[in-house]
A protein has these predicted regions:
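Conserved Rossmann-fold NAD(P)-dependent oxidoreductase catalytic core, especially the SDR/UDP-sugar
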Residues: 45, 70, 132-135, 145-195
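Glycine/proline-rich active-site loop of Rossmann-fold NAD(P)-dependent oxidoreductases
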Residues: 169-173, 229-234, 262-269
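Conserved glycine-rich Rossmann-like NAD(P)H-binding loop of the short-chain dehydrogenase/reductase
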Residues: 62-71
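Conserved beta-loop-beta element that borders a ligand/cofactor-binding pocket
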Residues: 205-228
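NAD(P)H-binding glycine-rich loop region in Rossmannoid oxidoreductase-like domains
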Residues: 71, 75-146, 150
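Mid/C-terminal beta-alpha module of Rossmann-like enzyme folds, strongest
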Residues: 38, 157, 241-279
Length: 279
């Protein structure tokens, strides 16, 4: 990643935003930032991740993408319309696998992330679809545990983790469909060829709730995802709702995620997402 002249000038500007949010006095992440906040992104070449990268780059963030296949990432970013200049100047690629926990820890340590600068982590990786009866070996829980432990080491706070509509936990006392979702995970997900993906998310969420409250986590729970044109209009956009949309466009989820990670009002929440009236 190379910084051009304009980016160097931006990096020495100090932006100030005063005040805190009403949620537990959590200060905005952009307070006194010396450079555009960095986004360390896991799952950047996936259906959602490519759009998270696109909107984060277009919002002037420096994006650090942890990915197995750098060539694939560059290809999908071209496909979704990211300008070559943004890729050249604002994107840094770290090659690695989410199952390699040492590589995951190194990515967090070596990215030089700073809570004071408003830097964040977004985790939107997941197991691919596959017709299977058993869930298989968990992938996300060990990876997120490694990320969380390393965040504590370096003093970083904010992380957004994408799960799914079937993800639930007894602490989600406002979720009236808890038992129904537990049934879906056990019996219906194999028929939908998403057993591995759903079970991975289902195992991860309780860990986040019970072991990560010292961090500023956000857990998103979108419904069925599809590669469709944006459904956002002048009147409606993807946002927090009581129940999830039946189908959510990857592009809309990517745009929401790239913004939501910086929203302190969402810290320690697990929002369902649907198309709601713009505020």
């Amino acid at each position: 990643m190379k910084l051009g002249k304009n980016r160097v000038l931006q990096s020495i500007l100090v932006c100030q935003q005063k005040g805190t949010t009403r949620r537990s006095g959590i200060a905005p992440l952009t307070t006194r930032c010396m450079a555009p906040p960095k986004v360390l992104l896991f799952g950047s070449s996936g259906g959602t991740g490519r759009y998270v990268a696109k909107f984060a780059l277009e919002a002037d963030h420096n994006v650090i993408a942890f990915v197995r296949n750098p060539a694939k990432l560059r290809s999908v970013l071209r496909q979704v319309g990211v300008s070559p200049a943004l890729v050249e100047n604002n994107l840094k690629i770290l090659e690695g696998d989410l199952t390699d926990l040492n590589a995951v820890r190194s990515a967090v340590r070596d990215s030089v992330l700073s809570h004071a600068n408003g830097d964040v982590i977004i985790e939107c990786a997941g197991k691919p679809k596959g017709c299977q009866i058993l869930a298989g070996k968990p992938m996300l829980l060990p990876a997120v545990r490694a990320i969380a432990e390393t965040m504590r080491e370096i003093g970083l706070k904010r992380i957004l983790i994408q799960t799914g509509a079937m993800s639930s936990d007894t602490r989600l006392y406002r979720d009236p469909s808890y038992l129904f979702k537990a049934c879906l995970v056990t019996f219906m997900s194999p028929l939908m060829c998403i057993k591995g993906m759903v079970s991975d998310n289902y195992a991860l969420v309780p860990y986040v709730y019970r072991e990560m409250d010292d961090l500023e986590w956000i857990v998103s729970r979108p419904g069925l995802l599809a590669e469709k044109p944006s459904r956002s209009t002048d009147a409606k956009a993807l946002g927090v709702a009581w129940s999830e949309a039946f189908v959510t466009s990857y592009v809309d989820l990517g745009e929401w995620t790239a913004k939501a990670v910086f929203n302190a009002d969402l810290v320690h929440t697990s929002p369902s997402l649907a198309y709601v009236k713009r505020k």
